Regions:
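An acidic/histidine-cluster motif and surrounding catalytic segment
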Residues: 2-218
Length: 218
């Protein structure tokens, strides 16, 4: 669910960066809620959510819905080295393989792979503009119950929206905010095994507390 300023924000970004090949997408969901180290209206990042986004035809034309890059030996060598060197999610390439084997097109992996293979960045608003209302047992990407979801993940689905102020304040340089990436990875326990263990334990205890035994043995 977007707030009202999401639409004029996307329109201005689409116009401003229409021909800038460095930029591949405009995000709306900011896991910081309000990014503490950003004095501008938005910043640039290599990590993003597809919960509310906009892009251009030039970007979509580069997508490989059949995951052809997985069959390109040189591209995979480059991609594996990039993921390792920049500390991206270790499960990214296995996730792409799983998605390819499913026979379905998953936008999150197709989009992110395209961005990495083309050295692109996403525009992230400094304030969260999107609510995700899709946490339930029938959800496509995050199935479960709100009450048995660990607190850090529950926060993501209950996060407030904040309107952006106009006119927008544009950043002077196109450079990635790597601190945002580190915070997002910590929140999601990517590359943080101890945090992941604690979240799994929290989920186990919540399932026991609410008698959701099917969630324990799934």
């Amino acid at each position: 669910m977007p707030c009202q300023s999401f639409f004029p924000f996307c329109k201005e970004m689409l116009d401003r960066y229409e021909h800038d090949e460095r930029i591949a997408m405009i995000a709306g969901f900011n896991e910081d809620e309000v990014t503490p180290d950003c004095e501008d209206s938005y910043f640039f990042t290599s990590v993003f959510s597809i919960w509310g986004w906009a892009s251009w035809r030039r970007v979509v034309d580069k997508w490989e819905g059949d995951y052809a890059f997985l069959r390109d030996k040189q591209a995979m060598q480059r991609l594996q080295s990039l993921v390792k060197q920049r500390g991206y999610r270790k499960d990214f390439i296995p996730m792409c393989r799983d998605h390819a084997h499913s026979g379905k097109e998953f936008y999150e992996s197709i989009f992110w792979a395209s961005m990495l293979l083309n050295s692109s960045l996403a525009i992230m608003p400094s304030r969260n503009l999107i609510n995700n209302l899709g946490l339930s047992a029938d959800s496509t990407h995050f199935a479960g119950s709100m009450k048995t979801t660990p607190k850090a993940y529950r926060r993501i689905f209950t996060m407030k929206r904040h309107e952006l102020e106009f006119p927008l304040k544009h950043p002077k340089y196109v450079v990635e905010n790597v601190d945002f990436k580190e915070r997002l990875y910590k929140t999601n326990a990517w590359g943080h095994p101890l945090i992941k263990m604690s979240r799994s334990l929290e989920e186990l205890l919540l399932n026991l507390r609410y008698g959701n035994f099917s969630g324990i043995f799934k």
